Amino acid sequence: MLIIETLPLLRQHIRRLRQEGKRVALVPTMGNLHDGHMKLVDEAKARADVVIVSIFVNPMQFDRPDDLVRYPRTLQEDCEKLNKRKVDYVFAPAVEEIYPQGLEGQTYVDVPGLSTMLEGTSRPGHFRGVSTIVSKLFNLIQPDIACFGEKDFQQLALIRKMVADMGYDIEIVGVPIIRAKDGLALSSRNAYLTAEQRKIAPGLYNVMNSIAEKLIAGNRELQEIIAIAEQELNEKGFRADDIQIRDADTLLELTETSKRAVILAAAWLGQARLIDNQSVTLAQ
């Protein structure tokens, strides 16, 4: 496994891979890798000749400076995990390598609509940062495939739209959420939880299951369902942030013709903002 930190070296290897006709898969990450990331790697390995994992804590997508500062950085441990998984390349650039002129005046990619709705409302600029860095990685690495987790449901939808709109010839693969045995979705931010909070954390998944059961049963009183769910979260020790029930295919409000719903949930537990989602097939 080769660790690449500079753009010239990356370009050199990408040119060689292209000349050899290799099928390349990219797994973009911000590091602090867990089993969910490893599932992305496994999916990439099954679909391509060469797997490149990027590790870059992207300052452009953080809406709070304190969150950027304390985001876990575990490059050595990450590389050890990826080496055991027989990843071919790790691209781990410094911020100065990606944004040599700094963030001020940086050209960016903005996906209208999806960037400012739902999660984008409470995190202004976040999705613009995501689409910009992903676009930059696509331009640099020129992958045939890119793998993303379905835990970040809105992010995946945004990237799919960006790829379609920008004409990228890249297959976007969504990989299902990996959960702990108690249902908690694996996330790098779970590291912020204390031992006591970790015991409480699966409550978010349980509340989503309760919402799903109501939707499957035909209940469409969405405001009431959401209000009850927020109350349940607060009673469990969370601070409910945002719960939405949307059309899974458009992320717009549910209509009578919606075939699938997605429950999008975000809640604070101590210093950790946990997000999760669950899709439900609706009775027609």
Curated annotation (Swiss-Prot):
Please name one Pfam family that this protein belongs to.
Pantoate_ligase
Which pathway? Cofactor biosynthesis; (R)-pantothenate biosynthesis; (R)-pantothenate from (R)-pantoate and beta-alanine: step 1/1
Q: Which GO terms describe its cellular component?
A: cytosol
| Miscellaneous comment text of the record | The reaction proceeds by a bi uni uni bi ping pong mechanism.
Q: Which residues form a coiled coil?
A: none
- The answer on whether this UniProt entry bears the keyword Ubl conjugation reads no
Q: What is its EC number?
A: 6.3.2.1
Q: Where in the cell is it found?
A: Cytoplasm
Q: Where is the active site?
A: H37
Q: Which CDD domains match?
A: PanC (cd00560)
Does the entry feature the keyword Ligase, yes or no? Answer: yes
Q: Which residues bind ATP?
A: 30-37, 149-152, 178, 186-189
The record's NCBIfam families line, in alphabetical order, gives: cyt_tran_rel (TIGR00125), panC (TIGR00018)
List, in alphabetical order, the Gene Ontology terms for molecular function in this entry: ATP binding; pantoate-beta-alanine ligase activity
Enzyme kind, highest EC tier: ligase
Upper classification of the organism: Bacteria, Pseudomonadati, Pseudomonadota, Gammaproteobacteria, Enterobacterales
Name the chain's protein: Pantothenate synthetase
Q: Which GO terms describe its biological process?
A: pantothenate biosynthetic process
The UniProt keyword set, sorted, is: ATP-binding, Cytoplasm, Ligase, Nucleotide-binding, Pantothenate biosynthesis
Catalyzed chemical reaction(s)? (R)-pantoate + beta-alanine + ATP = (R)-pantothenate + AMP + diphosphate + H(+)
The family annotation for this protein states: Belongs to the pantothenate synthetase family.
